[in-house]
């Protein structure tokens, strides 16, 4: 899946779970 283990934000993300962790990573 795309974006796993990479930084993300609430406005822009592409994580497996579709959300960002509190640490700002997928």
UniProtKB/Swiss-Prot annotation:
One GO location term (cellular component): extracellular region
InterPro entries in the record: Conotoxin_omega-typ_CS
Keyword check for Secreted: yes
Record PTM Cysteine amide, positions in chain: 26
Transmembrane segments: none
SUPFAM superfamilies, per the entry: omega toxin-like
Domain statement: The presence of a 'disulfide through disulfide knot' structurally defines this protein as a knottin. The cysteine framework is VI/VII (C-C-CC-C-C).
Free-text function comment from the UniProt entry: Omega-conotoxins act at presynaptic membranes, they bind and block voltage-gated calcium channels (Cav). This toxin blocks N-, P- and Q-type calcium channels.
Record family assignment: Belongs to the conotoxin O1 superfamily.
Name this polypeptide is given: Omega-conotoxin CVIC
